[in-house]
Amino acid sequence: NNSIVVGTGNKVEDFGIGFYTKYGDGGVDISPIADLMKSEVFKISKALQINDEIIDAKPTDGLWDDDRSDEDQIGATYNDWELIMNILENGVDPDEIAEELKGKYDIYIKHHMANKHKMIGIPICKIPKELKS
């Protein structure tokens, strides 16, 4: 029907900690905000005059019957993740990260490494031509 699935993941969720379901909310054709940090999405939302109720809503994946937020599940705030991602993108040695961020850095790395498979394309096994015939 000439349609595409548009993703809603931001850079922190999609390429930082991989906080999405690979073939669920990660199964998209285009992801227009995936290069924006969560704070940048908020700034754009305010500039576009998106309803404050939407902007101020607690981020949640909606998979639980309680009120746990993304941040409750992940163990840190989106601001923490952004700070750590910015530090890493600027080439700072992880050993130089401030002591108060070390625990959150460790959580970030744990999530990032566990979910890295979501952030790369599907691996393809190249079959030699002679085996195909």
Describe the predicted segments one by one.
Residues 1-133:
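ATP/NTP-dependent adenylation/nucleotidyl-transfer catalytic domains that generate, transfer
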